[in-house]
Amino acid sequence: MEIILKEDIVNLGYKNDIVNVKSGYGRNYLIPTGKAIIASPSAKKMLAEDLKQRAHKLEKIKKDAEALAAKLEGVSLTIATKVSSTGTIFGSVSNIQIAEALAKLGHEIDRKIIVVKDAVKEVGNYKAIVKLHKEVSVEIPFEVVAE
């Protein structure tokens, strides 16, 4: 029996795979629990169209991320914070302050996709990575100065 999986199933296949299973396993378990549907010609055609649309959508998202990466490429930030007499920062500079500095420049970036490698606790130059897509990321230099 040929079926189309609706979710990942261990030792059988991944979502949207067309697999052959024994009739009893398909009819009595996979189809009633909603984990699969029968791979009829119309279902195969719908699956192909769905995969085509999904690929097109993912390609558009990647292009948008690459366009934003090109805009962010030349950006460098200056973040002013309160500093002690020894040059250490009260607290630290995190992705929240970097997102706010980018917002002031007109780039609304979610703070969750900004990664700062090391803890920023002193005045100086650092780099943050903005992960716009799983294949597209931008390194943004920023300088921490005394307020």
From Swiss-Prot:
An example Gene Ontology biological process: translation
Ribonucleoprotein keyword on record: yes
GO MF, one annotated term: rRNA binding
Tell me which domain of life the UniProt entry assigns to the organism this sequence originates from.
Bacteria
Q: Which Pfam families match?
A: Ribosomal_L9_C, Ribosomal_L9_N
InterPro entries, sorted: Ribosomal_bL9, Ribosomal_bL9/RNase_H1_N, Ribosomal_bL9_bac/chp, Ribosomal_bL9_C, Ribosomal_bL9_C_sf, Ribosomal_bL9_N, Ribosomal_bL9_N_sf
The record's keywords, sorted A to Z, are:
Ribonucleoprotein, Ribosomal protein, RNA-binding, rRNA-binding
User: What's any one GO cellular component for it?
Assistant: cytosolic large ribosomal subunit
Q: What does it do?
A: Binds to the 23S rRNA.
Which HAMAP family has this protein been placed in? Ribosomal_bL9
Similarity remark: Belongs to the bacterial ribosomal protein bL9 family.
Q: What is this protein called?
A: Large ribosomal subunit protein bL9
Taxonomic lineage: Bacteria, Pseudomonadati, Bacteroidota, Bacteroidia, Bacteroidales
Q: Which gene encodes it?
A: rplI
